[in-house]
Amino acid sequence: MPSFDTVSEANMVEVKNAVDQAGKEISTRFDFKGSDARVEQKDRDLTAYADSEFQLNQVLDVLTGKLVKRNVDVRFLDRGKIEKIGGDKVKQVIKIKNGIETEAAKKIVRIIKDSKMKVQASIQGDAVRVTGAKRDDLQAAMAMLRKEVADLPLEFNNFRD
């Protein structure tokens, strides 16, 4: 029986490349000369540092631009609060989401069941497995999920025939 998995995970290699490129651009830009503006990465956490809130927003604009160029969906980014760290300096922690949360997975299963398509959906950890009798039904389910679930960056993998 054909099936596929619906997942939501960022390509961490591309994220690291984007962070490195953003760091290079920030270090060479004239408006950041003499400032402590930078972006650091630890596992799935990015931390942006700057001298002011305005500069922090510029650093984040550079970072999101680099992420978009490297085909990393910015919906993976979960921005935290802007924190003051001594003097005028500020920082912001950005978490990279991984996996589909249970509420979102239940929403995906409900959308598939409400569509009356000839496919079944089941939650498997942080992924949703969709099975059906025909490949055409699965492709229709993929198209429908792309259209219906706009707030999550979904990927389809592990396609089995």
From Swiss-Prot:
<dbReference type="GO" id="GO:0000166">
    <property type="term" value="F:nucleotide binding"/>
</dbReference>
<dbReference type="InterPro" id="IPR007551">
    <property type="entry name" value="DUF520"/>
</dbReference>
<keyword id="KW-0547">Nucleotide-binding</keyword>
<dbReference type="InterPro" id="IPR036183">
    <property type="entry name" value="YajQ-like_sf"/>
</dbReference>
<dbReference type="Pfam" id="PF04461">
    <property type="entry name" value="DUF520"/>
</dbReference>
<comment type="similarity">
    <text>Belongs to the YajQ family.</text>
</comment>
<dbReference type="InterPro" id="IPR035571">
    <property type="entry name" value="UPF0234-like_C"/>
</dbReference>
<protein>
    <recommendedName>
        <fullName>Nucleotide-binding protein mma_0840</fullName>
    </recommendedName>
</protein>
<comment type="function">
    <text>Nucleotide-binding protein.</text>
</comment>
<dbReference type="GO" id="GO:0005829">
    <property type="term" value="C:cytosol"/>
</dbReference>
